[in-house]
From Swiss-Prot:
One GO molecular-function entry: ATP binding
NCBIfam families to which the protein is assigned, alphabetical: tyrS
Organism classification: Bacteria, Pseudomonadati, Pseudomonadota, Gammaproteobacteria, Enterobacterales
UniProt protein name: Tyrosine--tRNA ligase 1
Keyword Ligase: yes
SMART domains linked to this entry: S4
Reaction catalysed by this enzyme: tRNA(Tyr) + L-tyrosine + ATP = L-tyrosyl-tRNA(Tyr) + AMP + diphosphate + H(+)
Gene: tyrS1
Organism field: Photorhabdus laumondii subsp. laumondii (strain DSM 15139 / CIP 105565 / TT01) (Photorhabdus luminescens subsp. laumondii)
GO BP term, example: tyrosyl-tRNA aminoacylation
Length: 424
C-alpha cells in the first residue's frame, strides 16, 4: 500500500467510515510521513476481534511509510469509555489494569515494526502523563477548553443521559477529556497528526482534534474505521461462547481458525478486504473463481489461513489446520498433546471420566445418546468411533491404548457428533 492515494486505497477496501477534512489529510499524507496513533484501553486481559481492524489500519499506514504509535490506556482503562454503552462499566483495580496494560502492549507489538528506521513504530501509555496530574491542573489546563453544552450533545453519551434508570457518572463523563488530551500530548511529544479508531470513537476523536488545535494551534486529523457487521445482522466477532479473543489462552488457534472458516459467503470477500493485505485484484479474482468453480468456495480457507497466520503465527496456523483435518477424517493419530489441549480448551464438548469407565457410559455422559440402551444400539450398528477407529463391541471397556498421552480420548457418534474425554 503506497502513500500516494492512501485514503483512496483505504476507501476502496471499505476501511473508512468517517474522516475529518479528507482533502487536507490526503494532501498532508502526500507531502511525507505522518505520525498517527490508535488507542487500546485495557478493559480485559486481551484484545478481541473488534480491535483487529484499527490495529491492522496502523500497520497499513506503516507499510505506506508512516509512523504508528500504539497507545495503551493505562489511565483511561481505569475510568472506562461510556461511548454507546448502555450501562456503567465496572471499575477495575489499578493492579489489574497495570497487568492488562502489559499484556495488551505485548499483544500489539507483533503487528507493527519497531525497527525499520525512520518510520519505526512506538508504544505509549497515557498513565505516564495522567498518573501524576493533580485535579486542579486537570480542571484548569484541560477542563477549561471543554463546553459541557457540546459534551452532552454528543451521540456517544446521549442515550445514557436520556435514561433516568442508568444515567452517567462524572467519572465516565470525563473520559472524553482524557482521550482528547491524549491526542494533544502525543502531538507535542511524538508529532502525532492523525488519530484513528473505531466508528464509536468519532466523538472522542473530534474532541481531541479541537483540544489539540486550541493547545498547539496545529492542524490535526481524525479517521474512523467502520463497525464490522455481518450480512445477517448478527454481531461480528462473537460466538455462542462469547468474544473471539486474540490471546490463544482465551480463544485457541483452532477455534479462531474455525471462526473464519464459518464466514458466510455473503461476507467473506468483504472480510478479505478488511482483515488481510491481499490485493483487491486478487480478491476479485478469487470471488470470480469461486463463482464459476461449481464447488464450495475457497475464500473462507484463504481468509482463515491469512488471519490465523497473522495473529497466531505459522505454528498456530499449522496446529489449527492439523486439528481441522484430523477431526474431518475422524482420526486422532496426527494430533499432538498441545492439539488436544486446544480441543479441551474450547474446541468441542469435554467430559471427565475415571479410568475403568465403559463406552456406553461415556456416550451417555457426553450427551451423544440419551440412554445406555441407545448407546448399545449405536455401538452395535458401527456408528461409534474411538480415536477414529470404529468400535462395535457393546460392552467395551476403555483400555490404556485408548488414552492418548495418557490423558485424552476422542469419541465420535456418527459423522459429526464429537466429544473429548479427559481422563482423571
Amino acid at each position: 500500500m503506497s502513500s500516494n492515494n492512501l485514503i483512496k486505497q483505504l476507501q476502496e477496501r471499505g476501511l473508512i467510515a468517517q474522516v475529518t477534512d479528507e482533502n487536507a489529510l490526503a494532501e498532508r499524507l502526500a507531502q511525507g510521513p505522518v505520525s498517527l496513533y490508535c488507542g487500546f484501553d485495557p478493559t480485559a486481559d486481551s484484545l478481541h476481534l473488534g480491535h483487529l481492524v484499527p490495529l491492522l489500519c496502523l500497520k497499513r499506514f506503516q507499510l505506506a511509510g508512516h509512523k504508528p504509535v500504539a497507545l495503551v490506556g493505562g489511565a483511561t482503562g481505569l475510568i472506562g469509555d461510556p461511548s454507546f454503552k448502555a450501562t456503567e462499566r465496572k471499575l477495575n483495580t489499578e493492579a489489574t489494569v497495570k497487568e492488562w496494560v502489559e499484556k495488551i502492549r505485548r499483544q500489539v507489538s507483533p503487528f507493527l515494526d519497531f525497527d525499520c528506521g525512520e518510520n519505526s513504530a512506538k508504544t505509549a501509555n497515557n498513565y505516564d502523563w495522567f498518573g501524576n496530574m493533580d485535579v486542579l491542573a486537570f480542571l484548569r489546563d484541560i477542563g477549561k477548553h471543554f463546553s459541557v453544552n457540546q459534551m452532552i450533545n454528543k451521540e456517544a453519551v446521549k442515550q445514557r443521559l436520556n435514561r433516568d434508570d442508568v444515567g452517567i457518572s462524572f467519572t465516565e463523563f470525563s473520559y472524553n477529556l482524557l482521550q482528547s488530551y491524549d491526542f494533544a500530548r502525543l502531538n507535542e511529544v511524538h508529532g502525532v497528526e492523525l488519530q484513528i479508531g473505531g466508528s464509536d470513537q468519532w466523538g472522542n476523536i473530534t474532541s481531541g482534534i479541537d483540544l489539540t488545535r486550541r493547545i498547539t494551534q496545529k492542524q490535526v486529523f481524525g479517521m474512523t474505521v467502520p463497525l464490522i457487521t455481518k450480512s445477517d445482522g448478527t454481531k461480528f466477532g462473537k460466538t455462542e461462547g462469547g468474544a473471539v479473543w486474540l490471546d490463544p489462552k482465551k480463544t485457541s488457534p483452532y477455534k479462531f481458525y474455525q471462526f473464519w472458516i464459518n464466514t458466510a459467503d455473503a461476507d467473506v470477500y468483504r472480510f478479505l478486504k478488511f482483515f488481510t493485505f491481499m490485493n483487491l485484484e486478487d480478491i476479485d479474482a478469487l470471488e470470480e473463481e469461486d463463482k464459476n468453480s461449481g464447488k464450495a468456495p475457497r475464500a473462507q480457507y484463504v481468509l482463515a489461513e491469512q488471519v490465523t497466520g497473522m495473529v497466531h503465527g505459522e505454528e498456530g496456523l499449522a496446529a489449527a489446520k492439523r486439528i481441522t483435518e484430523s477431526l474431518f477424517s475422524g482420526a486422532a493419530a496426527d494430533l499432538t498433546e498441545a492439539d488436544f489441549a486446544q480441543l479441551a480448551q474450547d474446541g468441542m464438548p469435554v467430559i471427565e471420566l475415571e479410568k475403568g469407565a465403559d463406552l456406553q457410559q461415556a456416550l451417555v455422559n457426553a450427551g451423544l445418546v440419551p440412554s445406555r440402551g441407545q448407546a448399545r444400539t449405536m455401538i452395535s450398528s458401527n456408528a461409534v468411533a474411538i480415536n477414529g477407529e470404529k468400535q462395535s463391541e457393546p460392552e467395551y471397556l476403555f483400555t490404556d491404548s485408548n488414552r492418548l498421552f495418557d490423558r485424552y480420548t476422542l469419541l465420535r457418534r456418527g459423522k459429526k457428533h464429537d466429544c473429548l474425554i479427559c481422563w482423571k
